[in-house]
Amino acid sequence: MLFAQLTHAIGLNDVCDALRLHSGPLSALRGATAPSRNNLSHANKRRDATLAERLFWTVLEHLQKLSPGFATGRQGKGLARRFRRVIHVVDSSTIALIASCIDWAQHRRRKAAAKLHVRLDLHSLLPRFVLVESAKAADSIRAAEVCAGVKPGEIVIFDRAYVDFIHLGVLNGDGVFWVTRSKESLCFRVVKRLPKPTDKRILSDELVVLKNKDSRANYPEAMRRVRALVEIDGKEREMEFLTNNVSWSATSVADLYRCRWQIEVFFKQIKQSLQLCDFLGNSANAVRWQVWTALLLYVLMRFLCVMSSWSHSFTRLFTLLRATLWRKIDLWDLLRFYGIAGGHFRYLATPQSAYLPGFAQ
């Protein structure tokens, strides 16, 4: 399945034929042989996708132990590092499927889709929670499950689709700081207006309580409402943010929510670079297998980025790996010197020969 991701295979025949054509190098992997189409189809349908899920978390844990810098995030800069707290970003993305072939994921009359819920560590850009399911359920139903691993003192940022006042009350009681957008239909009453900062982007800063009887029963405490101008695509838009923290500056609240867009970059990377458009099977199990292997490849590529100080785009790394898939090349040297004038890499062996480290130089 990782091979299918790297080659952007659009069908079972693509995988089987390509592996059969490279049977020589493939046999060097403990005598591996290319699967038949029927065997691959049966495994894709019957083999429990929980195996792929466990493999993903096991590999991620191993890589984090292998390199502490990979776990903590060497890319954490600016706001993420200034807060010196773990910052979680929560969002979901729909993965389009073929409605005529897939009935388990139909969520509209003529559409079918799977939904990927992710809680991302903002410092390391690594997933901390992943849920793959049908797109039928609303995001707010999964809010408590997605945020179950957040610890007291940490920060969680999510879109207004995840707003559930029972869940917000639980987070507040557990000592978790949260930031989200306010729904347009939110009914509230202002109890205190906070001093307005000098930043002209901040339009108002106030403490509010909910007016709706049921909502106030679920969240009786006052919450902070910040109204600010946020630049999106070169234009300033007015947005309203809610948080349970009253000590941060209003500018920090707005900047924190803006960091949530990092998860949009994550979804863009896996959906544009990896194979999440054409699926090798129509069953729920087959779709989950392909999603989990895509996430596994993302983690492996993220590890390569951090350890080799890769300065180019994620897509460029993917195309480079795909081009060198059947070449016995020192990958670290290739990534380290890629794009540098005079940079070089060395072959570990000719493509069709066995690689026996320690026997020959």
Whereabouts are the PLM-identified features?
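Single, function-defining residue in the core of a domain
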Residues: M1-D14, A18, R47, R54-L55, ...
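Short edge-strand/loop segments of extracellular domains
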Residues: H22
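Major-groove recognition helix of helix-turn-helix-like DNA-binding domains
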Residues: A28-R47
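Short Lys/Arg-enriched helix C-cap and helix-to-coil transition segments
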Residues: L51-S67
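A short, well-structured juxtamembrane/interface segment
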Residues: K65-G76
